[in-house]
Regions:
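Short, amphipathic alpha-helical "lid/cap" segments that border enzyme active or binding sites
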Residues: 116, 120, 205, 209, ...
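Serine-dependent acyl-ester chemistry module
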Residues: 143-277
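Catalytic His-Asp segment of secreted/periplasmic serine-dependent ester chemistry enzymes
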Residues: 235-332
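Short catalytic/ligand-binding loop motif for oxyanion handling, primarily in non-cytosolic enzymes
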Residues: 81-84, 115-117, 144-149, 234-240, ...
Length: 336
């Protein structure tokens, strides 16, 4: 039995149904989303594909919250969706609802493998389903940076997206003959230079800033405060993880893992540069900014098992990060 199966058996539920080759739905505008009405002991979704949150014995989701007078939103990608959690009650939205003294629960607005443009569009398309929104937290940052290394023909103006190869290949098959497709691919390969790390960071920051501007306008209209949280990576938090993390990381790397694709992004220098530029962008827009990495570093021991992979949390990790995030949000409010 592999370490992934032994230490994180819940990950099979995600890889079977929620991975790129799982039962995803192709949708207008956001491209793809989670399975509808999915039921399992690990993850459950509503009729629109949003994951349920648990709070005080009740469950809520974007498409199933008519019983609420108000709510709070945590939006983002797979970390917010809760990849790694062994059940819905262990996601960030659930743990924040349980650990937060306020009455309105947190609703999970996470979209697996979304970039910042998709995150913003998802919210704009579905906010009419929600009751009054008291607060919005956008926890994001990695996917824009990771996708920024793709060629310009995939990134274009609004950012590359995961599974973009399938989309572009399908479009080409309709638009080109076999000969012209072969020629165009040869030309594309000749110009597919990988951007420098500096260019990747600049592109990701500008894309995030533009989408944050849209988030700010939406939240201003709703009179809901907005906070941007830079999501942490395992190697940003600490150079060497807990023993369980190191076993999982090593096993995943043998299969062509995270470090192989995003090695330079894992460095402290990249983290600090990216963090500072995003913080400056938030300051320009008047948006509250939280660097979760440094807050976690100040709160955990070296042997604490926090991550199931380099970007997703264990159950205990979700609870710890939720508590830290609540504390950070409270500190921001006291200072404002």
């Amino acid at each position: 039995m592999s370490y992934v199966e032994q230490l994180t058996p819940q990950m099979l539920a995600y890889s079977k149904e929620f991975a790129d080759n799982g039962k995803i739905n192709w949708l207008p505008y956001v491209m793809y989303f989670h399975p509808y009405n999915h039921r399992s002991s690990v993850v459950n979704t509503d009729s629109r594909g949003f994951r349920y949150s648990n709070a005080c014995g009740k469950i809520y989701s974007v498409g199933d919250c008519s019983q609420l007078n108000s709510c709070r939103i945590i939006a983002g990608s797979s970390t917010v969706f809760g990849i790694g959690a062994s059940a819905d009650c262990h996601t960030l939205a659930s743990r924040m609802s349980i650990n937060d003294p306020h009455t309105s629960p947190w609703i999970n607005f996470g979209g697996r493998s979304f970039n910042s443009t998709q995150e913003m569009i998802l919210f704009s398309l579905n906010r009419h389903l929600l009751p009054e929104i008291d607060e919005v937290v956008l926890m994001s940052g990695f996917n824009d940076l990771g996708l920024a290394r793709l060629p310009a023909r995939f990134r274009q103006e609004h950012g590359a997206f995961f599974m973009g190869n399938q989309f572009h290949s399908a479009m080409q098959s309709f638009q080109e003959t076999r000969v012209s497709r072969w020629v165009s691919r040869r030309k594309a390969v000749e110009h597919d230079d990988v951007p420098s790390l500096e260019e990747q960071i600049s592109y990701a920051v500008e894309l995030t800033r533009r989408n944050l501007s849209n988030w700010s306008a939406l939240c201003s209209d709703m009179k809901a405060p907005l906070t941007f949280v830079l999501q942490p990576l395992a190697n940003w938090v600490r150079v060497r993880g807990a023993k369980e993390e190191e076993l999982l990381f090593a096993e995943r790397e043998k299969l062509g893992g995270f470090a192989q694709h995003y090695g330079d992004i894992l460095s402290q220098e990249t983290y600090e540069t990216y963090r500072d530029k995003l913080a400056a962008a938030c300051d320009e827009l008047g948006i509250s900014f939280i660097d979760l990495t440094s807050a976690i570093q100040d709160s955990i021991s070296d042997d604490l098992w926090l991550f199931v992979d380099r970007i997703h949390f264990t159950d205990e990790g979700h609870d710890i990060v939720a508590r830290i995030l609540i504390e950070q949000l409270a500190m921001k409010k006291r200072k404002s």
